[in-house]
Amino acid sequence: MMSCLWVALIPIANLLTLFLPILTLANFVPDHPNVVIIFIDDMGYGDIGPFGSDHSTPHLDRMAKEGMKLTDFYVSSAACTPSRSALLTGCYADRIGMGKSVVFPADKRGLNPKEITIAEILKNAGYATGCFGKWHLGDQPQFMPLAQGFDEYEGIPYSNDMWVRGNPKRKYSPLPWIKGNKPVAHIPDVASQSVVTDAITDAAVKFINDQKDKPFFCYVPHSAVHSPHMVTPARLATAKGDVMQALVSEIDASTGSILETLRRNKIDKNTLVLFTNDNGGAGKTSSGPLRGAKFGPKYEGHMRVSTLAWWPDKIPAGSVSSEIMATIDILPTVANLAGQPIPKDRIIDGHDVSDILLGKDKAKSPHKYNYYEKDGIREGKWKLVRYRVKADRFTELYDLEKDLGERNNLAKRYPEKVKALTEALDAHVGKIEAGIRPAGLVENPKPLLADSNGIPTLVEYRNK
């Protein structure tokens, strides 16, 4: 009887042996995390709950409680195209020829395909890569996401104000909704504008669901809260007619959907999520305690952005860092976490800040200086701003520890500090200008969508 029982148990033992690797894999958390970057457009420093806003942002509030709030995080340029260029390459936009202005529909200029993006680094490490949202780094085929390291793309190729109902002084082609490299819908009216955030979110969530069993990089550059400010009637009603509250609520809900997708697939503890913004706020946004906004002199509200980092059990929950970090640091940080080297054949301006994010003892900012393009510099608590009003030049100095709102100009009291910071800023600008790498250029660029005849609106496309 005992021998028969032993024989009967052998197949069961074999089955357990067969499935043991699968069971082990299901509970195994690899060293290299998935990466999600949520990049908001034109949102102010004070527009979300974790940074003092009265707007209702429950998902971002939870993200901050479960992760880290970065109070001194900066973009490297204060405009759509330059800021995105810096984020994806780890380089100052001026260094790679993308700092002068935004690109327009059918522009001959775009991000040079010879530049190396976060997507290309992670793809080399075996990651699936997807971009969902506003690209705005050139709309010619050699500049688009599929040529810059992304396996998948869905979204709008440039700003949502570059459409037929936009600037009457500029003749725009229809604003296309792209999937891969192909226009599959267009955005002709307010109704179509109002569903863009949901369309971006749905595409990102689908990508995460599809790729949950392998490493992935999901880049989500929203077009909200950039003007024109379009939201669904239902969201506007919930916000009691406050358009900015409705837009911020929309972004909060989108972020919540992405985080919940990670939790539901049980990959949240192996995913780094960064939530940040492309520049200071514009229009009816709030800079909170900061002076300035997207346009104007290089005050803090111009380039300091509300940023959250989330990676359960890795990033200390409820933590706050006031160390200086910037979007140019994301590429080297993510490369290190993925076990990949950063390019050695070119200058990469950013630094690995993973020790700060992971809460390591005594981790400090790698930046001696933070630069505000060509007209501002910060060293520790000291901040120098220079600007022109017509023919007049102005230089101001602030102590950010005592005067975060930059109201008490100390330039006359500390002339030596003004001199030292001015020299450091000029030296930085000189080095950048001496080694500019060219932007990508094409001859005879063509619009992605010259005529919308026969192509559905985005609302129609989503309702198929």
Locate each region found by the language model.
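Long, internal low-complexity/basic segments
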Residues: 28-33, 40, 44-45, 69, ...
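Formylglycine-dependent
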Residues: 98-100, 105-108, 112-124, 137-216, ...
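A short beta-strand-to-alpha-helix junction
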Residues: 53-57, 68, 74-79, 105-116, ...
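C-terminal cap/loop subdomain of S1 sulfatases and analogous C-terminal strand-loop tails that border
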Residues: 147, 151-152, 157-161, 281-300, ...
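Loop/turn elements at helix/coil->beta-strand transitions in domains of secreted/extracellular proteins
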Residues: 32-36, 66-71, 125-130, 151, ...
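Histidine-centered active-site microenvironments of extracellular/periplasmic hydrolases
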Residues: 141-149, 228-231, 239-247, 260-314, ...
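Short, solvent-exposed turn/loop segments enriched in Gly/Ser/Thr/Pro and often Arg
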Residues: 49-55, 69-91, 99, 131-143, ...
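Active-site segment of extracytoplasmic enzymes that catalyze sulfate/phosphate-ester chemistry
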Residues: 37, 45-130, 140, 145-152, ...
